[in-house]
Amino acid sequence: MNRGGSSASASANYLLCTNCRKVLRKDKRIRVSQPLTRGPSAFIPEKEVVQANTADERTNFLVEEYSTSGRLDNITQVMSLHTQYLESFLRSQFYMLRMDGPLPLPDRHYIAIMAAARHQCSYLINMHVDEFLKTGGIAEWLNGLEYVPQRLRNLNEINKLLAHRPWLITKEHIQKLVKTGENNWSLPELVHAVVLLAHYHALASFVFGSGINPERDPGIANGFRLISVSSFCVCDLANDNSIENTSLAGSNFGIVDSLGELEALMERMKRLQEDREDDETTREEMTTRFEKEKKESLFVVPGETLHAFPHSDFEDDVIVTADVSRYIEDPSFGYEDFARRGEEHLPTFRAQDYTWENHGFSLVNRLYSDIGHLLDEKFRMVYNLTYNTMATHEDVDTTTLRRALFNYVHCMFGIRYDDYDYGEVNQLLERSLKVYIKTVTCYPERTTKRMYDSYWRQFTHSEKVHVNLLLMEARMQAELLYALRAITRHLT
């Protein structure tokens, strides 16, 4: 791969509106570029992130201590809106990429590339192409999967399943990897690889959900670069639709309506907390509510435009560049609803039967020393992180809201908590937020700024980044639970 030009070419992914789709059908050679939007995010005004970074010396210390690139990249800048979480994130990522472990350093970065490619995340691919070469990786491997050792290629199946349908992973997939003669994986190596795959699938969700901009590359003339899918359609470029302009357009939904939505949400949260004290819901009723929510998630269409975004004419077509496709096999394989229409007996992962705390943590720690502690700290940090605020309101208990976000992600992956009332999900998560969650979690490359702007319009960008952190960690934990359960079954 040409390192100097890879960012430009690999970012050439567009979510197309109807008119642009028609144009591209006539001339597929179209190539459009625009100046980068300023700042680390195409969704968040630069000044909000810069102010946070300037005010917090802790961020700079963490970058010096744990950054593999040695600089304050755009992901870190956006995450620095939540410095407590950032420390847990950087420590765990640094450990899996740079500290002692079963896998060679270059292999770790190549696995990160393979994971990011499942979601066409050119930002992460470009980052780890550089890291792969810096750690002594063989440049020829960057020509595509056919140039890498068969042992690495054998990860394709589990990479594909983890990224899109982790519930399909079985002990047979594990056995195939650990019993393949000279190309076999040891269990510690496989656990390391699984942790990396899950981490970078989930991180791709954060990149797209937060509108992370490509890193500025002084080698690109005039500051031009092909824009990534997460921000705009190509027709926005001709109309000079910047982040400021699209933010103004989003305000047309109505400030009064959004204020009413906020008050209504807070009232529902308060009522749920009061009702829980007198709750006598049976276990059977909770199971019924889970099945209902699981089936209803079928009708939450990712990237949905007709119902949730009436002023948008986006369609689902995405152009995948060769720079991305060289790192994946079976590119058409994607997320499929766990609860498919027409199925009566839907297999469910009961969280109580295989929990992270009681099963996954001990297994991963036994086979890949200490990573379990770091991941556990990160999961707990994001789940419990709160400033007791909602938009302009203070002293608010957001526990029910955070739990609903986390459990809704797991519900879409078929994971049920027996002690959770899934009726709370419908009461707390509005339809536009459900569309956003499903898109970011299951089809992150389809995320647009309009989706980001459409939900919780009175909330701060910091609060929306917090949502993205919850979605990212919920997704990573779901992938790990399925993979580690399969490894456990292989061992027993």
UniProtKB/Swiss-Prot annotation:
An example molecular function term from Gene Ontology annotations: oxidoreductase activity
InterPro entries found in the cross-reference section: AhpD-like, Sestrin
GO cellular component, one term: cytoplasm
EC number: 1.11.1.-
Amino acids binding L-leucine: 386-389, 398, 463
Region ranges (N-terminal domain): 62-243
Expression sites (tissue/organ): Detected in liver and skeletal muscles.
Record's keyword terms, sorted: Cytoplasm, Oxidoreductase
Superkingdom of the organism of origin: Eukaryota
Domain note: The N-terminal domain may have an alkylhydroperoxide reductase activity.
Function: May function as an intracellular leucine sensor that negatively regulates the TORC1 signaling pathway. May also regulate the insulin-receptor signaling pathway through activation of TORC2. This metabolic regulator may also play a role in protection against oxidative and genotoxic stresses. May prevent the accumulation of reactive oxygen species (ROS) through the alkylhydroperoxide reductase activity born by the N-terminal domain of the protein.
Subunit structure and binding partners: Interacts with the GATOR2 complex which is composed of MIOS, SEC13, SEH1L, WDR24 and WDR59; the interaction is not regulated by leucine. Interacts with RRAGA, RRAGB, RRAGC and RRAGD; may function as a guanine nucleotide dissociation inhibitor for RRAGs and regulate them. Interacts with the TORC2 complex; through RICTOR.
Protein name: Sestrin-3
Organism in which the protein naturally occurs: Mus musculus (Mouse)
Gene: Sesn3
